[in-house]
Amino acid sequence: MAKTPSDHLLSTLEELVPYDFEKFKFKLQNTSVQKEHSRIPRSQIQRARPVKMATLLVTYYGEEYAVQLTLQVLRAINQRLLAEELHRAAIQEYSTQENGTDDSAASSSLGENKPRSLKTPDHPEGNEGNGPRPYGGGAASLRCSQPEAGRGLSRKPLSKRREKASEGLDAQGKPRTRSPALPGGRSPGPCRALEGGQAEVRLRRNASSAGRLQGLAGGAPGQKECRPFEVYLPSGKMRPRSLEVTISTGEKAPANPEILLTLEEKTAANLDSATEPRARPTPDGGASADLKEGPGNPEHSVTGRPPDTAASPRCHAQEGDPVDGTCVRDSCSFPEAVSGHPQASGSRSPGCPRCQDSHERKSPGSLSPQPLPQCKRHLKQVQLLFCEDHDEPICLICSLSQEHQGHRVRPIEEVALEHKKKIQKQLEHLKKLRKSGEEQRSYGEEKAVSFLKQTEALKQRVQRKLEQVYYFLEQQEHFFVASLEDVGQMVGQIRKAYDTRVSQDIALLDALIGELEAKECQSEWELLQDIGDILHRAKTVPVPEKWTTPQEIKQKIQLLHQKSEFVEKSTKYFSETLRSEMEMFNVPELIGAQAHAVNVILDAETAYPNLIFSDDLKSVRLGNKWERLPDGPQRFDSCIIVLGSPSFLSGRRYWEVEVGDKTAWILGACKTSISRKGNMTLSPENGYWVVIMMKENEYQASSVPPTRLLIKEPPKRVGIFVDYRVGSISFYNVTARSHIYTFASCSFSGPLQPIFSPGTRDGGKNTAPLTICPVGGQGPD
């Protein structure tokens, strides 16, 4: 029966290695589909294996579109050879379905005329009376030629397996007629037949999609098996290779109705085959006798490997391995090409074609154990003992000599076994370390990818916000420019009208002035003519109009002036704030210190009795009442001080304290061993490294002599960083992101603790608490 497009689709997906299959799934998720089809859920694609993936594709898209979509994805991930093979197979299958009736009839007539040696019995022995058995349950074995005895399985390309399947089976699933002599000395059948025409035992069961056809010979031990034909399900469809696994009878599988011979009959056949050689047809028509095989022949292993098979010393690929003949050398995974007859290869032994490691054929005599090393001092004495004092192997005579008298001498096998156990233990340890390293590398890669994604997201966010700001400023610019242009146009129109009116008044005045000047130069008789009218007009001439700004213009100009001042102030504030915030990243020491932040709490057992604490021991302030507390050696009795917890003797520690608007405080670190009774001097010699705010905006460090500190911006939050290894204590103004002071070259001879003092009340001005603030960062070194 011909393969369906679904079978070709599954075969193509199984050809993908895991890495390419993951690329296929990822590309499939991002490939657009036709509108009439719904997309496969992403979760199902991510969990799917080849069989499940093929089922999902056919279920959601149908066979034809599933094949088209698979071809599109394969080409997208540069799997063009697989895409071309699937394309040819799909075209061939569609053309085969159109001519299925004629091909079926032709193949049926062809199957009736097959040679007897190539026909498959309908009712094999051991299964008679059960009706016709469907294909795929274990076909009858065909006889193999003698040159195939030394041949192992080799993987073939997909196109070649299709050709073999199409040539070896007709439309009804029966083997087609083929020539007994095939190229390369291959047998026409999938396996060797037992004597008397009985079929070998073969069980098949379903396996995972990662499986492959692995045939183990069901005959006597040491017998090889040829590649089986394709197997078909009862429905008529070919069973995918990933669902077939051949199980040898040595696995004690449960009884299966598809078994051709029972285990008892197989054992009897093996015993019969072990007593006499069997004649086996060869490609040239002759016969050759097989070696005796069975339990009585010690030269044959239980796994069915001939005695002349040797492993490659470098890649450990077993020549003629019945599983898959794959070279498993660390740097080589090339499937080995199986040879024909052992004697047909000449003097050069076959080997792995990639790592070029030849598989030397060794005779049974060459497999004898090598002689044990002999003692150099005492000839012919085998070194069977080991001297642990000299760390060398010795013989029995050496152990009795004066040189080794009283030494620890043990059997060399016992010492070797002990060292093997140590080696195994170290190997396990190193493998665990390597696994841990791989996990850490994977974790590091994940974190790096996560950080890169976060960086890219922040970059896009900043760009988007700045674009919004730029767009807003651009809009405001257009608004102001347009408003000012409107006001300018209005002022221009008003000025033009005013100029017109004033020009008319000036022209009238110029006319009257001219007339009066002319009258002044005339004679008396002419002067007195019309003088009254001219003088009247001169007295009643209108005064030129004064300039008056319209109220609308005044209001608009005032409004624009106010807005411009607001924009100027806002822009200045925004620029200063942004510059200040950006300068916070210019203190790399503070950023590095914050990476070593620790969780610090207040130790109430060390506190001055008047101090009041919060429930979480993160905040402290000075109270009004003297609390009656146990006066232990660790409590301060005269200084308003409380220590922090935990103490530390190594590494680097960082914590931050909110001081707010307090007018006095003390912060820093001190030795755990300091005296806590009576008055004390805060200095490094006495074990105190602190910064003190004595009065408002007056700061000093407790050095000798005290160092006055000039701080431009009073800190609202103070950061303290202690590097025990270097011997330094640094103070930072977290608010201004600036450095305050550093005690360098300190001598720490014991554990240190954080120290806090909220200061005196200062007439009610200093009642606010000191609060330990959380800091994001890594833990201590």
From Swiss-Prot:
What are the boundaries of the B box-type zinc fingers? Answer: 370-412
Regarding how it is modified after translation, the entry says:
Cleaved by CASP1. The N-terminal cleavage product localizes to the nucleus as a filamentous network and to the cytoplasm, interacts more strongly with RELA and NFKBIA than the full-length protein, enhances the nuclear localization of RELA and induces NFKBIA proteolysis. The C-terminal cleavage product localizes to the cytoplasm. Phosphorylation at Ser-242 is required for the interaction with 14-3-3 proteins and down-regulation of pyrin pro-inflammatory activity.
Composition-biased stretches (Basic and acidic residues): 113-126
Give the modified residues of type Phosphoserine. Answer: 242
Residue ranges, annotated region (Disordered): 93-226, 270-322, 336-373
Positions of the record's site feature: Cleavage: 330-331
What does the UniProt induction comment state? In monocytes, up-regulated by treatment with colchicine and IFN-alpha, by the pro-inflammatory cytokines IFNG/IFN-gamma and TNF, by bacterial lipopolysaccharides (LPS) and by retroviral infection. Repressed in monocytes by the anti-inflammatory cytokines IL10/interleukin-10, TGFB1 and IL4/interleukin-4. In neutrophils and macrophages, up-regulated by IFNG/IFN-gamma with a peak after 8 hours of treatment.
Disorder this protein is connected to according to its UniProt record? Familial Mediterranean fever, autosomal recessive: A hereditary periodic fever syndrome characterized by recurrent episodic fever, serosal inflammation and pain in the abdomen, chest or joints. It is frequently complicated by reactive amyloidosis, which leads to renal failure and can be prophylactically treated with colchicine. Familial Mediterranean fever, autosomal dominant: A hereditary periodic fever syndrome characterized by periodic fever, serosal inflammation and pain in the abdomen, chest or joints as seen also in the autosomal recessive form of the disease. It is associated with reactive renal amyloidosis and characterized by colchicine unresponsiveness.
What is the stated purpose of this protein?
A: Involved in the regulation of innate immunity and the inflammatory response in response to IFNG/IFN-gamma. Organizes autophagic machinery by serving as a platform for the assembly of ULK1, Beclin 1/BECN1, ATG16L1, and ATG8 family members and recognizes specific autophagy targets, thus coordinating target recognition with assembly of the autophagic apparatus and initiation of autophagy. Acts as an autophagy receptor for the degradation of several inflammasome components, including CASP1, NLRP1 and NLRP3, hence preventing excessive IL1B- and IL18-mediated inflammation.
Name used for this protein in its record: Pyrin
Taxonomic lineage of the native organism: Eukaryota, Metazoa, Chordata, Craniata, Vertebrata
